[in-house]
Structure formats: C-alpha cells, structure tokens
C-alpha cells in the first residue's frame, strides 16, 4: 500500500480506485500549535536523567527557537495548484528534492540564528556566525545537499540548524495542503507521501488511533500509516525482531529486519503517553549503538544527528 494526497473535489471520484483500509486515516498532519512546545518539554524532561543531557538540552533550545520563529514568521500559501499537479503525477506535493523553495526558509534560518545566539557557547556561536555570513548561494547549496541526502556536502555541525529552518518551512507548507489522503496499491511506502523524505521514527498511537503505527517524517512532521509486523523499509514480514534496553514493556524499541538489514525505532504511547518521535529517538542513542553492534543499519535520520563528512 502507498499513500497519495488528492484535492478534496477529486477524492470522491477516485475513491473506488483505492482503499481506505476501513476507517484508518492514512495520513496525519502535524498540529503546529503544540508540536514544538511539546517536543521542547519532552527533550527537557528526558535530559534530567540521561548521559546525553547536554545535547538534549541543546536540541531543546533549537525547538524552542523554532516555536518562536513559527509565531514571528507565519507563512500563507495557496497550495491548490501544487496539489493538482502532484495528484496527476503521483508525486508528493512538497517533494523536497525538487520543490522550488522561496526565501522564506532563509528568513526562518536567520530568525533561528538570532534567537540561539543569546546564550550559545563559543563553539556553537562560531557555527552560527559562519551560517550568518554565508551567501545565499552557499545556503541554497547546503539545502539542496541535505534535501537530497548528500550529507557529506554539509558539515554535521551546520546541518541541524539548516534542517531546523527547512523542516519548519516544510511543516508550515504541509499544514496548508487543501487535500485529503487516500491509500492505494503502490510502492515507496517508506517515504513520506507529503514531501518524500524519510522517517525519524515510528509511533504506535493511543486514543483515536489506538494501536495504529505511524511513521513520523523528519522534514515536514507529517505522519503516515504503515501496518505493524511489517518492515517499514522493505515491507517484508519474515524476519522481524524487536529490541529494547530495558524489558519487553519498554516504551522505546527497535524493529530490525533480517531481509534488508535495517532497523527503525518504534515508540509506544501505550507504555508512555509522553513519547515524542524526535525527542525519544534522540534520547535512546544507546539503543542505536546496540543495533549497530548487531550488524543493522539505521533506516532513518534524526534532525539533530546527521552523518558526518
């Protein structure tokens, strides 16, 4: 199964071509009113008793700055034309690798830099100064490289700040998509149907979507449904195993696939209602080390941890 977003007026006409898998919503858009505040609070909470406390606090400062930039720099767009075009082509409407960016994302980056300067330590301040002095051409090259997953072209010290601006920009655009999602037969379920990026982790929900697993996009913050007991990367079901650091009742586990040799974190709200896709993934890097020691490669990227040059 794959997911496509179509204009609302086309949904009824095309419903018979796909399947809604019962009443399961195939796609959930982020609630930007609470997303960054909740993430900040969770990062700060996890930092209280974690060997990575300093880095979790650092990430919390970035998400706090994202919340302020969201408030100070709203974005209003008419996405109807992009949605119609993407529905016809079968491509994500905000495909990060080809979508034409405006200067808005650079305004967001400038706002983040200005906010983070206040109490930044010297080594972070040096990175912020470097980005602040970068030309438009340099910044756009950095953005192109990150969005096309060519991480070697961007220093790992710069990437979290650039990505924070890009992600906020994409999340603002995604929140204004005037369409509905439908599930249909197809491929590439491992990629976000909104922007084509990859997940940071997956979350098994409680409440309205109780027991359903959604992959959380590391760019536009949308979530898309992928059934449990299936590899989110290759969709095989034969050789899946679940790993944790504590016990079978752990709220954070890693799902490994023997077919493709990858793993993805799964966060269970049933075990801990406070789990958050980015924060809990970042706070459980010891589990990543365990998985790499077992010979598995991570199939996702956390927006605060990019591969080095």
Swiss-Prot record:
Q: Which domain of life is it from?
A: Bacteria
One GO MF annotation is: ferric iron binding
Location (main, coarse): cytoplasm
Looking at the keywords, is Cytoplasm present?
yes
Q: Where in the cell is it found?
A: Cytoplasm
Which GO terms of the cellular component aspect does the record hold? cytosol
Q: Which GO terms describe its biological process?
A: protein maturation
InterPro entries tied to this protein = FdhE-like_sf (IPR024064), FdhE_C (IPR056796), FdhE_central (IPR056797), FdhE_N (IPR056774), Formate_DH_accessory (IPR006452)
Cell membrane: present as a keyword of the record?
Answer: no
Gene3D superfamilies documented for this protein: FdhE-like domain
Which UniProt keywords are listed?
Cytoplasm
Tell me any Pfam family this protein matches: FdhE_C
Q: What does this protein do?
A: Necessary for formate dehydrogenase activity.
Q: PANTHER family, alphabetically? A: PROTEIN FDHE (PTHR37689:SF1)
State the family it belongs to.
Belongs to the FdhE family.
Against HAMAP family, the record matches this protein to:
FdeH
What name does this protein carry? Protein FdhE homolog
Source species: Yersinia pestis
As recorded in Swiss-Prot or TrEMBL, the protein's gene is named fdhE
